[in-house]
């Protein structure tokens, strides 16, 4: 279930209504009046949830699946008896519409400081700070001018939140430092096709920032699609870094400016990223790995290795290839001209 501190539950909704919304057919004998209370991904589905299946790599985990599941016709037979198949041409789009119907992000509200905000002793608030309903701020924390802290956010002790920072759907540990203009907890980039065009997929997760993390100015960290985006203890992130939904960053990592981490990347402890490094989605970066500046990582990097280039590869291979290309470009042909010289 989405964290109730951040999301309102709008259900329950009858199964027949969700099926109609997603353009799905109820199987014969299914109880259309059955109440569905939440949308969930497969790993978290329960008897009163609706989920979806689009990739057969998840089949081994379906044995105990319950509730209802949007599927294409070819996959309906693989669902266990305890799960109701909702057959549709677009399971992901149907799930997105169901999630929008069942859940809604909590609003900040009209009060600059909501009446139920909890501030421990020694908290300092700059001019124009907005604190939404249910916000909790730990002892000795400073929040700079015009920062906006969304509903339900918890900030630990001795934190420093810079001017114009936006925090939402987030839980912060102690001694976290966030520089001016950073945006934490906005929806991750997720869309799928629908009958009337693209549909935004609701992002129902959170951002967890552990103790001692530093986040640079104008950096953005998206909340999870359903699970959490996690920034590990004592990790240091430079300005203008983008971290997408569901990313899990280990402890003591370093990311230089303009690094971009795509969705669902796993980063081990002590990994380092040079400026403008980019990582494709669902890649694993091992503990202690190093990624060179401007590298484009398209596959897993083993622990302790250093990679560079585009596409990224072990640094020695990349340096050898770069040196070879330079030599070939400067070779003189039979006419005495350089290979790269058309003059």
UniProtKB/Swiss-Prot annotation:
Top-level division of the source organism's lineage: Bacteria
NCBIfam families, per database record: lipid_A_lpxD (TIGR01853), PRK00892.1 (NF002060)
Function: Catalyzes the N-acylation of UDP-3-O-acylglucosamine using 3-hydroxyacyl-ACP as the acyl donor. Is involved in the biosynthesis of lipid A, a phosphorylated glycolipid that anchors the lipopolysaccharide to the outer membrane of the cell.
Catalytic site: 245
CDD domains registered for this protein in UniProt: LbH_LpxD (cd03352)
Subunit structure: Homotrimer.
Gene Ontology cellular component annotations, sorted alphabetically: membrane
Name recorded for this polypeptide: UDP-3-O-acylglucosamine N-acyltransferase
Annotated GO biological process: lipid A biosynthetic process
Catalytic function, reaction form: a UDP-3-O-[(3R)-3-hydroxyacyl]-alpha-D-glucosamine + a (3R)-hydroxyacyl-[ACP] = a UDP-2-N,3-O-bis[(3R)-3-hydroxyacyl]-alpha-D-glucosamine + holo-[ACP] + H(+)
EC number, as in UniProt: 2.3.1.191
Organism the protein comes from: Phenylobacterium zucineum (strain HLK1)
UniProt keyword terms in alphabetical order: Acyltransferase, Lipid A biosynthesis, Lipid biosynthesis, Lipid metabolism, Repeat, Transferase
Gene that produces this protein: lpxD
HAMAP family found in the cross-reference section: LpxD
Any one GO molecular function term: N-acyltransferase activity
Biological or metabolic pathway of the protein: Bacterial outer membrane biogenesis; LPS lipid A biosynthesis
SUPFAM superfamilies, per the entry: Trimeric LpxA-like enzymes (SSF51161)
Sequence similarity: Belongs to the transferase hexapeptide repeat family. LpxD subfamily.
Keyword Nuclease: no
């Amino acid at each position: 279930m989405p964290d109730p501190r951040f999301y309102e539950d709008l259900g329950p909704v009858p199964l027949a209504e969700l099926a109609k919304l997603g353009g799905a057919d109820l199987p014969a004998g299914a109880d259309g009046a059955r109440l569905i209370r939440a949308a969930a991904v497969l790993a978290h589905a329960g008897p009163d949830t609706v989920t979806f299946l689009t990739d057969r790599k998840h089949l081994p985990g379906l044995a105990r699946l319950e509730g209802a599941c949007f599927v294409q016709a070819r996959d309906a037979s693989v669902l266990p008896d305890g799960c109701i198949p909702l057959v549709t041409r677009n399971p992901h789009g149907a799930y997105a519409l169901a999630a929008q119907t069942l859940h809604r992000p909590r609003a900040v509200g009209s009060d600059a400081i909501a009446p139920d905000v909890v501030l421990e002793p020694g908290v300092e608030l700059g001019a124009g700070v907005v604190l939404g309903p249910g916000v909790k701020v730990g002892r000795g924390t400073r929040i700079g001018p015009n920062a906006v802290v969304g509903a339900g956010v918890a900030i630990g002790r001795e934190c420093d939140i810079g001017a114009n920072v936006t925090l939402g759907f987030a839980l912060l540990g102690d001694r976290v430092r966030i520089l001016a203009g950073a945006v934490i907890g906005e929806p991750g980039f997720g869309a799928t096709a629908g009958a009337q065009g693209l549909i935004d997929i609701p992002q129902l997760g959170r951002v967890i920032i552990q103790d001692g993390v530093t986040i640079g100015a104008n950096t953005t960290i998206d909340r999870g699609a359903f699970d959490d985006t996690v920034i590990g203890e004592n990790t240091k992130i430079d300005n203008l870094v983008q971290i997408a939904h569901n990313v899990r960053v280990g402890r003591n990592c370093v990311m230089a400016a303009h690094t971009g981490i795509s969705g669902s990347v796993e980063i081990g402890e002590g990994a380092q990223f040079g400026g403008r490094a980019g990582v494709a989605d669902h890649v694993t970066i091992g503990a202690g790995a190093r990624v060179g500046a401007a590298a484009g990582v398209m596959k897993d990097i083993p622990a302790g290795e250093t990679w560079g280039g585009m596409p990224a590869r072990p640094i020695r291979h990349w340096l050898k290839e770069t040196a070879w290309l330079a030599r070939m470009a400067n070779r003189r042909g039979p006419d005495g001209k350089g290979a790269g010289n058309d003059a």
